[in-house]
């Protein structure tokens, strides 16, 4: 599906932070170039919730949050925080663990107001709920629209995701492709792009250019300690992907 990156034609890896290279989905970055990155976490509204009340995934199950939580409509992500709350891997394929994570999600249902796709941004901005589980990219959109919203990566850890640049096998115009890839990796261009999109950049050259108000915001540029506790998703394979999806559908049908 993808062609390997030609290191003689692409000169931009030197600009990228090593913490965001050589991930399990592409050892050695043979096929991919990191474009943006982010996390899964909790958005809360400080008019109704204190930060200290949402610093752990386990706190979501508190009875005081009945009918107050919005979930992202994603089997992998919702199972991830349930598994993490039990001290398990986000890539768990042990039947007992996955079933236990499902049971724990079922127990959360009284606290779930809705399970949403992209509209979770609008719901949180309009204060339809005080808590939302979502990705950092969408969280940045929410925060830009409502000063009372904040984003937390729970202390137990979470998922770290990447948007990557890659070359499909069907590609033909390689001169233009590598010109584009090198252009996008130039620190000044990567910095401008990050400011426009409002996602976290893995480009260390861009980090030096971006204002400290951006790169110093630990909601979206967390500490090394936090980064070490973030995990990429592995491909579960067709069988286990279907198991997760089936169990998630059962969860969504759970009576409140």
Describe every region a protein language model picked out.
Residues 1-111, 116-128:
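Extracytoplasmic ligand-binding site segments that recognize negatively charged/polar headgroups
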Residues 2-15, 32-33, 147-159, 168-171:
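Short beta-strand->loop
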Residues 168-228:
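Mature extracytoplasmic/periplasmic domains
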Residues 225-256:
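Conserved C-terminal helix/tail region of periplasmic/extracytoplasmic solute-binding proteins
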Residues 125-126, 131-148:
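A ligand-binding cleft/hinge motif common to bilobed small-molecule-binding domains
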Residues 41-48, 84-85, 161-176, 184, ...:
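A bilobed periplasmic-binding-protein/Venus flytrap-type ligand-binding module shared by bacterial periplasmic
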Residues 57, 120-123, 139, 177, ...:
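Short, hydrophobic alpha-helical packing/hinge segments within bilobed ligand-binding/sensory domains
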């Amino acid at each position: 599906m993808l062609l390997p990156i030609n290191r003689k034609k692409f000169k931009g890896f030197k600009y990228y932070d090593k913490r965001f290279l050589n991930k399990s989905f592409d050892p050695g970055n043979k096929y991919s170039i990191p474009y943006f990155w982010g996390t899964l976490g909790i958005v809360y509204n400080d008019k109704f919730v204190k930060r200290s009340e949402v610093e752990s995934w386990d706190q979501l199950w508190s009875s005081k949050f009945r009918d107050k939580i919005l979930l992202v409509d994603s089997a992998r992500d919702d199972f991830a925080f349930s598994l993490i709350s039990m001290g398990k891997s986000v890539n768990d394929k042990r039947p007992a663990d996955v079933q236990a994570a499902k049971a724990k999600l079922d127990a959360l249902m009284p606290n779930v107001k809705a399970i949403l796709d992209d509209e979770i941004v609008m719901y949180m901005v309009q204060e339809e709920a005080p808590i939302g589980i979502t990705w950092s990219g969408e969280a940045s959109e929410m925060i830009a629209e409502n000063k009372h919203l904040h984003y937390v990566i729970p202390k137990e850890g979470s998922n770290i995701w990447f948007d990557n640049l890659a070359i499909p096998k069907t590609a033909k115009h390689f001169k233009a492709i590598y010109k584009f890839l090198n252009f996008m990796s130039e620190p000044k261009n990567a910095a401008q792009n990050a400011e426009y999109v409002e996602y976290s950049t893995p480009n260390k050259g861009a980090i030096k250019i971006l204002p400290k108000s951006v790169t110093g915001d630990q909601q979206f540029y967390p500490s090394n300690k936090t980064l070490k506790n973030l995990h990429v998703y592995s491909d579960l394979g067709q069988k286990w992907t279907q198991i997760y999806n089936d169990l998630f559908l059962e969860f969504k049908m759970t009576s409140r």
